[in-house]
């Protein structure tokens, strides 16, 4: 049941489970953290009621026991214990959301918000990249609390998203060759607070992204380089490293 298009695998650290999107099977596969070899998933969310069609990425909220799936003009939310042909417990979507092509999502369970990496459509049909920030439990046709978008934002083909709650920061891979970092309080046409990579950097087509705050590290996988790169950025993670040193 595994395939080549699973770009947003996530891990539920509270339950020690690996949660995997399966685009071709229109399914979510949940494996035990200890799974190895040809192992069956412990649960599979799949079927006509799920509304899953072409999922590429997902995100796990371990604190509240939920799975978030960006699916085009909507974000589907499932219970982590769901199994079989089950409907989402919430669906975020509609004209008021401002997006038509959601590709990634991340959850901040501390602030009770989600960040959706998406595009809106301009009057002439162009895609307008954005990071839309919603209440975590938002459902239906609702407006975002804030939207980062515009020329100064430098958003372009957003990949995976990670949130660092302690610092109030959101990290995104930009597949044009860099990682961008904003404050979760940013709104409108604002530039990133920090960037990793760029025109003279090593990154070419970053996809995967993770954070290791204890070691001040931003970890990026690059499709073009076929490599995983680790950047030390203590200026971003000072609060947690200072506390750990006490």
Predicted segments with their positions:
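Beta-rich, blade/repeat-based domains predominating
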Residues: 1-15, 48-64, 96-111, 119-122, ...
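A detector of repeated loop/turn-to-beta-strand junctions in beta-rich toroidal repeat architectures
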Residues: 25-27, 39, 72-74, 86, ...
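Short loop/turn segments immediately following beta-strands, especially the blade-tip
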Residues: 31-38, 77-85, 133-141, 181-190, ...
